Regions:
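Glycine-rich phosphate-binding loop of ATP-dependent small-molecule kinases
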Residues: 2-531
Length: 531
């Protein structure tokens, strides 16, 4: 949702559309160092109406359940961030506001990609989430204290932009607040608190630390704000000296932003109309290159199956696995044998090492979140293995075919999925993706067999027959999916599955090869570090 919520008289940044094209740093904090203040009489006169309006818009947000509100809190220590959020909780219904603080990463978080900790805390549609210590705090602290260099900061900035763009495209309304104090104001505030026996406890080590690194923090903060203020998620710089001004400004920005978003027509599609995808002119698909006659006889199958299962068992116990997690994605035609292949993989492992996640239609809670949210919840820790039976690719397959999302939604999903998988790769997750392919005649034979065999009858449903009628549509969607998401980061493996034995062995062998290649890269990297 492209909502630049805010009131022009309170937005202290240049137009974000103009700002995003500037190449030189701007003194964008100057307007937050001029002594903004609201007298007590004015504050007391305005608060009742503002509070009533905020409650009204908050309950309308809850009733409509069309989008979540995400509030990112950043800025100078001592500039009133916590006090302002406390005030908002007093003015609004705190039961509908989830305040989250991201301090030092826990062991659970360190074992997963960096974005995992944020995805699992996203507010559902109809609710508000306040994030302290968010992705901007992490990148700024890292750069100020020399834990990362400029190149890594630029990567983090680009990652934040992609994350926010996706959340907004999924409907989220994002407010980004930078609470500011000049260096002189910050030191004066800290001294006043330190001299007050009743309030000195409010000063944290981080406050004193930031007073020493103020110039660097503001320098890199300006760079981050300049690079990430966009029309869909602009920054609002708030002078933090006067609590009355601070509270009214934030309250009015939230009010007008939410009012504007709620006025948009229901079901309004996000984004522009995408360029159309056309079928291959010569009707050829990558699936046509598969040799569907490949098969294994029973003796060869049993020998190779045992060999590959033993190989997988050993690789999963390898000490180098402690630096990695493994994710396998199983997609394919109905009746292509995904379940049988997954069982042969699981048979090689200790049940404590893996988790199988069957994916069906999203639940009510899952529909209240961005579509990738439910998959982020299941990303394994290092040393562990998660099998997805169906996956995030439903966005560009069944949701595309059945019209469950707009063309703009599934078209942008290719890039979002590539970014998601790159984040996994960068965190040490090995992603192996399978499309199990069978021809139309083989599918018909398996459907008929399922109807004829009582203990297999549960496997066949009306949806299977209905999907079969859309064979050509799915074939085109699979071709587009492979073309756009088979990358160096995470390639698709197309599995000839007319013969189930061949398919099962190929799946196991591919997983083993992926693990061995990842371990070899780990060895090379460790050897280079030792030098």
């Amino acid at each position: 949702m492209a909502i630049a919520g805010g009131i022009s008289s309170y937005v202290l940044l240049p137009n974000p559309l103009v700002l995003s094209h500037l190449e030189t740093e701007l003194p964008m904090f100057e307007s937050a160092e001029i002594g903004h203040a609201i007298d007590k009489d004015t504050f007391d006169a305005e608060v009742p109406a503002l509070r009533e309006a905020l409650l009204e818009v908050q309950y309308e947000l809850q009733q409509q359940k069309r989008f979540p509100v995400i509030i990112l809190i950043n800025g100078i220590e001592g500039a009133g961030k916590g006090e302002t959020v406390k005030l908002l909780n007093e003015w609004m219904d705190p039961r509908l506001i989830e305040v989250r603080t991201f301090d030092q990463q826990t062991d659970e978080e360190l074992a997963r990609p960096p974005a995992w900790r944020y995805w699992r805390q996203l507010p559902a549609k109809g609710r508000m989430g306040v994030f302290f210590g968010n992705w901007y705090s992490q990148m700024l602290q890292g750069r100020v204290h020399g834990q990362i260099k400029d190149a890594r900061l630029d990567q983090a900035i680009a990652g934040a932009e992609r994350l926010e763009k996706m959340l907004c495209d999924e409907g989220a309304l994002i407010f980004k607040f930078w609470f500011h104090l000049s260096k002189k104001q910050m030191k004066a505030r800290l001294k006043a608190l330190a001299d007050d026996p009743l309030h000195s406890w409010r000063i944290s080590p981080l406050d004193w630390q930031q007073s020493e690194t103020y110039d660097k923090f503001v320098h890199f903060g300006e760079r981050v704000l300049r690079r990430t203020s966009r029309d869909y998620a602009p920054w609002h710089v708030i002078e933090g000296v006067d609590s009355n001004y601070r509270g009214l400004t934030v309250g009015k920005l939230l009010l007008e932003g939410m009012q504007n978003a709620l006025k948009l027509p229901k079901g309004k599609a996000s984004g522009m109309n995408p360029a159309p995808l056309i079928a291959s002119v010569d009707k050829k698909s990558l699936l046509d290159s598969l040799d569907m006659t490949l098969r294994l006889d029973k003796d060869d199958y049993e020998e190779q199956l045992i060999t590959e299962q033993a190989r997988l068992s050993g690789l999963m116990r390898d000490k180098r696995m402690r630096k990695h997690a493994l994710v396998t994605v199983f997609e394919g035609n109905d009746a292509a044998g995904k379940g049988g292949a997954i069982r042969r993989v699981a048979a090689a492992l200790d049940p404590r090492q893996y988790h199988i996640v069957p994916i069906a239609a999203p639940s009510e809670d899952e529909r209240a979140q961005p579509y990738l949210w439910r998959f982020w919840q299941k990303i394994p820790a290092r040393g562990m293995f998660t099998v997805f039976d169906r996956s995030w690719y439903g966005r560009v397959l069944v949701e595309r075919i059945e019209g469950f999302c707009t063309p703009a939604d599934w078209m942008r999903a290719y890039g979002e999925i590539n970014d998601f998988e790159e984040q996994l790769r960068d965190a040490g997750v090995i992603v192996v993706k399978f499309w199990l392919a069978i021809d139309k005649q083989t599918q018909l034979e398996r459907f008929q067999a399922r109807e004829d065999i009582p203990f297999k009858r549960f496997k066949i449903t009306e949806d299977d027959w209905r999907n079969r009628d859309k064979w050509d549509d799915y074939r085109a969607a699979v071709g587009d999916m492979v073309d756009r998401t088979s990358t160096e980061v995470s390639a698709w493996t197309l599995v000839e599955a007319n013969d189930k034995r061949w398919a099962r062995v190929k799946v196991l062998r591919t997983i083993n090869q992926a693990l061995e290649e990842a371990f070899a890269k780990t060895d090379k990297h460790d050897k280079k570090k030792r030098k």
